[in-house]
C-alpha cells in the first residue's frame, strides 16, 4: 500500500488539495506527521506542504537515519475509517496550550521566508506540524499558499517516507509487540500503543522524534546538523516527554484523562529513575552509617520503663566518664556518665555515685561488627546520691589540694592481743599516727606481707571509724585471695598477670577515692604493696620522655608514684589520709634502688625489715635501730618519750639480733606495752644506779 500511495502523491500544493482525506492521512502517516489521522483536510494539506520543504536536508542524512531508526513493520498505515472516529475539534484543546506555543508557531514561516538555513526551517516546521490544529483556521490558508510554490522531487519524498516510517510507528504508538495487533483501528492502536510502550519508548521515540523535538532549538546543540541530536539520549528523553504531552492533548477525552494522569506519574525516564535510585542508595548508606553510631545507649525514658539502680566509683576521663560497677578497673557492666552531668553535679574522679539506668531487655552489650568488638554501655539516667549524700546541682565542695597538711597528732595504736608481738614492736619503735606517710623497707622474703596484714587488722580493731583500703599492685593471685579473706577492709588488687596500664589505673582511682573521703572529713588508711612495683608499672605505661636514669628508669615515670605517696597528710580541721607503702630493697636490681632512693626522704615514718633476721626465722624481722618516726613526740606522751629514748640508747649498743631478742623477750613477759615501758624504766634506772 505504501508503494501505490507514493506513486499517486502529487508534487505540488494543488495536487495535494485534490486528494481525498483518506489519501492525505495515509501520506501524512508515511511522512511521519504526528496527529495526521485527527486533522481536517485543509490542515493536512498545510502540514504536508510544510513538511516537504525540509526534504533536501533530510536526504543528506538518509543513510545515517536508516541505520539508527528502528525497523518498522510493512503495513503500519492507519485505515481511512479511523480518521472520522479519531477526529477531535480544536476547540476542545486547552487554551493555555495554544497561548504557550504561539511564539513557536509563528517562528517557522518567518525563518523560511528570510532565507535561513534549511535545517532551522525544517526544525521549526516539524515542531509546528503536530500543533497546527490548535491554531486558528485562517492560518491554514496562508500556509497553504506558501507551500504551493515549493515542490520536491518524488524520489526525495519516497526516501523520506521510508525513513519516517519507523518514526511514525513510535509517534503514533502503533509499534506492536505481537503480530495480531496490526488490524486494530487508528485510535485504539494509538491509545494502546501509549500504554504498552510507556516503559521503554523514551529511548526509541527519542531517536525517532529528534527532528521534531521542540526543545532542540532551545538546547542549541548542533543546530546546523539536526540529525546529530538523534544520538543524544538526553534530548531523546526530552522529546519523548514532549510528544507524550502532545498526544495527551490530541487523543480525545474518552481515555485521555486517565492517560494524562498516568503519563504525568510516569514522566520520569530511565535516567531520572537512576538518579532517584542513586539518591536512595546514598540515603540508605547514610542511615547504615548512622546506625553504627555511638557506643553509648542513651535512651529516652517513658512511664513504663523499669529503672535499675547502680552504684560504683566514678572514673572521669578526657571526654567522658564511667561508673565502675565491678571494682576499680574497667568492666563490661560499667555505666556511661556524660560530661554535662559531671559538671552539673560537680562530680570528681573517685566519687561514689548511685543512680538508676534503663536496661534493655534481651539486648547484648557485646556487639560484633566491622571486624572489631564494640561494647555498648548503658547511660546513667540521673544521679541519686554522691558519696552517700543526696545529689545537689553545682555544690560547693572542698578541694583536697587546698587543705592544710599538718604532722600527725592522733595516734593509731596497733596493740591488740598480748600474744601478737609484731604490732606491739611496731607500736613501740615506729608509732603510726593519722596522716602518716610511712615506708616499710623490706628485702624479699622478709615478711612484709604478714606485717601489712597485722597492721590492717590492728587498725580496724582499734579504730573502726577509719576507712581501710588495701591496694595490691602486681601481686600474686593467691596473696590477693589471702588478703581478701584475712583483712576486714576494702581490698583493691591488680595481679601481676594484668597489663601495666591496669596497675596504674587502679592505683590512681584508689587514691582519688581516698581523697574524696578525706574531703568529707573521714580518716582513711591506705596500705600499698608495693611502691616499687607501682613505679615499674608507670615506667612501662607512661610515655617515654627521653631522659633515662640509671637502671633504665624514665625520669617521668617517677612522678606519678611520688604524687600517690605525697597525698598522705593530716588535715588541720578534720580528716586524714595515711599511706603505708612497702619498698623493695636488696633485690639486685638497679631500678629498684633508684626507685627507693626517690622515696627515701619523702616519708615521715620508716619501718625497716632485715633479711638476716628473716633467714634465721626471727619474726617480726624488724631492724629496731634503723626504724623510727619523725616527730614522734607529737604522738607519745612526755613520759613515753623519755622511756623510749632511754630504751633506744640501750638497744643501739647491741647488735641487730641481740637488740631484737632483748626487746621481744621483755614484750613477751608483759601483757601490754604500758607495762613493758614501766618495766623498762625501772630496769634502766636500776642498772644505771648500780653502775
From Swiss-Prot:
Instruction: Give the InterPro entries listed for this entry.
Output: AAA+_ATPase, ATPase_F1/V1/A1_a/bsu_nucl-bd, CSD, NA-bd_OB-fold, P-loop_NTPase, Rho-like_N, Rho_factor_ATP-bd, Rho_RNA-bd
SUPFAM superfamilies (alphabetical): Nucleic acid-binding proteins (SSF50249), P-loop containing nucleoside triphosphate hydrolases (SSF52540)
Q: Which GO terms are recorded in the biological process aspect for this UniProt protein? A: DNA-templated transcription termination
User: Which residues form each disulfide bond in the chain?
Assistant: none
Report biased composition (Basic and acidic residues) as residue ranges: 50-64, 120-158, 188-273
Q: Which keywords fit this entry according to its UniProt record?
A: ATP-binding, Helicase, Hydrolase, Nucleotide-binding, RNA-binding, Transcription, Transcription regulation, Transcription termination
Domain of life of the organism encoding this protein:
Bacteria
Outline the segment boundaries, as ranges, of region: Disordered: 48-303
The family database entries (Pfam families) matched by this protein are listed as: ATP-synt_ab (PF00006), Rho_N (PF07498), Rho_RNA_bind (PF07497)
* Rho RNA-BD domain span: 307-390
Residues that bind ATP, according to the entry? 433-438, 445-450, 476
Q: What is its EC number?
A: 3.6.4.-
Query: Which Gene3D superfamilies does this UniProt record tie to the protein?
Result: Nucleic acid-binding proteins, P-loop containing nucleotide triphosphate hydrolases
Entry GO MF terms: ATP binding; ATP hydrolysis activity; ATP-dependent activity, acting on RNA; helicase activity; RNA binding
* Composition skew (Low complexity), residue ranges: 65-92, 105-119
Q: What does this protein do?
A: Facilitates transcription termination by a mechanism that involves Rho binding to the nascent RNA, activation of Rho's RNA-dependent ATPase activity, and release of the mRNA from the DNA template.
Oligomeric form and interacting partners = Homohexamer. The homohexamer assembles into an open ring structure.
Question: Which NCBIfam families does the annotation name?
Answer: PRK09376.1, rho
Q: Which family does it belong to?
A: Belongs to the Rho family.
Record protein name field: Transcription termination factor Rho
Report the gene name. rho
